[in-house]
């Protein structure tokens, strides 16, 4: 009868402390991701309408918060399905348009001429950073609450089987066409035309008119709507987790039935989280969507891949789960902070996941927790 990932982990490990720590991690990681999406959506709107960035952040805040409060989970799932299909088509269209604009394979020569390291297989720093982003976002798909909530909402086993095939295929196709775009964009975008990587897609669709003025404008709107859809998904997950697993959590199970008062409190948290993320997105120094997304994904990977994925199949212990989540969080935040101050070039996802997995496996072998039951695994 679990309604949130933190709720499930608390039940799975029979620990209220596990539930609360998991809820804190979900809330913090969600805010990081919300900030990144707010910035991305606002930049796209600013590029399309030629409005100040702050005005666009405010517009996104008002629109997405309003329809999240009005529609709830069902509206989020329906809009996500449509926007996901549009994004899949759009990703392929952008990749083909960029390939054509760069004269096919000649685009790699242009990239190499600009900077030989960009096309070098020995540029380990760049390769490590690229793989880190792919890993952080990839493992996030396995354990992120807003993704798992979609499977919670499937109506039967048949729908679950279909989703288990369609979802990985869609991810592979999207990754395959979008990940190379950053490097390919260097051959098309003139030096000094943009200030940060956050502006790559708005520039390609706007100033460069990669898909033409009409189609480019339409797809830019698709990107904005997809970003807004991501915002409402994260808002619902984070708000329900804070309300249910932090504010209302007790040593006994919380009733699965929601009263009107419960709904009102969750809505209040939706507003608070949305406003907080939007305000932080306005801070001048917060200007790297990739960095924030990778940071958020690294936290999920270091903390939840061991305790949620591995914990379904091997011996479980609340102490092990707590130690893993806390250590994983400290490792990711610590390495991320050191890199911001130039003390290391290491990507936080690598030590975070490595330490989290090794610690969980070692402590699981030494703990006296019970083995997972067949019912646990089926859940």
What are these regions (language model features)?
Residues 1-379:
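Membrane-embedded helix-loop-helix hairpins and adjacent transmembrane boundary segments
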């Amino acid at each position: 009868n679990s309604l949130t990932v933190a709720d499930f982990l608390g039940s799975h490990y029979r620990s209220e402390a596990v539930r609360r720590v998991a809820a804190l991690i979900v809330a913090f990681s969600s805010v990081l991701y919300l900030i990144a999406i707010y910035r991305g959506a606002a930049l796209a709107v600013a590029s399309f309408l030629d409005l100040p960035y702050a005005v666009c952040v405010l517009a996104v805040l008002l629109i997405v918060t309003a329809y999240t409060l009005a529609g709830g989970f069902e509206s989020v799932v329906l809009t996500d399905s449509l926007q996901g299909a549009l994004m899949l088509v759009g990703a392929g269209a952008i990749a083909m348009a960029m390939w054509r604009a760069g004269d096919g394979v000649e685009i790699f020569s242009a990239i190499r001429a600009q900077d030989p390291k960009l096309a070098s297989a020995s540029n380990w720093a760049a390769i490590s950073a690229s793989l880190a982003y792919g890993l952080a976002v990839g493992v996030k798909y396995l354990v992120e609450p807003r993704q798992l909530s979609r499977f919670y909402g499937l109506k039967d086993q048949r729908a679950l089987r279909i989703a288990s095939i369609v979802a990985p295929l869609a991810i592979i196709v999207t990754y395959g066409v979008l990940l190379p775009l950053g490097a390919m964009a260097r051959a098309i975008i003139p030096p000094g035309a943009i200030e940060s990587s956050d502006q790559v897609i708005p520039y390609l669709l706007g100033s460069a008119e990669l898909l033409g003025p009409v189609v480019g404008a339409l797809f830019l709107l698709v990107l904005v709507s997809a970003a807004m859809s991501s915002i409402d998904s994260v808002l619902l997950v984070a708000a329900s987790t804070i309300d249910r697993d932090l504010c209302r959590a007790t040593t006994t199970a919380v009733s699965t039935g929601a009263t009107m008062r419960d709904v009102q409190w969750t809505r209040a948290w939706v507003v608070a989280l949305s406003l907080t993320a939007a305000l932080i997105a306005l801070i001048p120094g917060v200007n790297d969507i990739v960095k924030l997304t990778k940071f958020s994904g690294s936290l999920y990977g270091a903390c939840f891949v061991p305790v949620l994925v591995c914990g379904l199949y091997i011996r479980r212990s609340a102490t092990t789960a707590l130690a893993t989540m806390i250590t994983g969080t400290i490792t990711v935040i610590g390495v991320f902070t050191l890199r911001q101050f130039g003390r290391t070039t290491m990507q936080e996802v690598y030590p975070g996941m490595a330490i989290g997995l090794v610690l969980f496996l070692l402590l699981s072998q030494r703990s006296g927790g019970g083995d997972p039951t067949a019912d646990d695994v089926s859940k």
